[in-house]
């Protein structure tokens, strides 16, 4: 089988976003971050545990008709730090780049500390400092290391 045959296991998209080099097994978490649950009508292709020289195994997500916001890319970088984002228009890659981990994410994660000011009826957006081993709430210092997708705020 040629390299081209392997690359076309998932068909090309006309317009939208391709998220490549996601660590194997993380594609469903990427869909959760993007709020894609199958009910919105988004056309999505997912390839999981594909062979990868760089990662061993990788996942790929293709979303037709949608370009990611910077907030989405920032949160995505927390669970897929090696991901590459490709913007597709008329079947051509018009923009390509690796995700960059921000130093802070704001308003996209929910603090698990029930006593944190961001979880009460206060008009305060959550704010987390991004570290190498997790994220830390800047209000109560609670650290989230595991299951980050479970703490994503619904839009």
Swiss-Prot record:
UniProt-listed Pfam families: PyrI, PyrI_C
Cofactor note: Binds 1 zinc ion per subunit.
Annotated residues for binding of Zn(2+): 111, 116, 137, 140
Cofactor: Zn(2+)
Listed InterPro entries: Asp_carbamoyltransf_reg_N (IPR020545), Asp_carbamoylTrfase_reg (IPR002801), Asp_carbamoyltrfase_reg_C (IPR020542), Asp_carbatrfase_reg_C_sf (IPR036792), Asp_carbatrfase_reg_N_sf (IPR036793)
Subunit and interaction comment: Contains catalytic and regulatory chains.
Protein name as it appears in the record: Aspartate carbamoyltransferase regulatory chain
Record organism: Haloarcula marismortui (strain ATCC 43049 / DSM 3752 / JCM 8966 / VKM B-1809)
Name of the gene encoding the protein in the UniProt record: pyrI
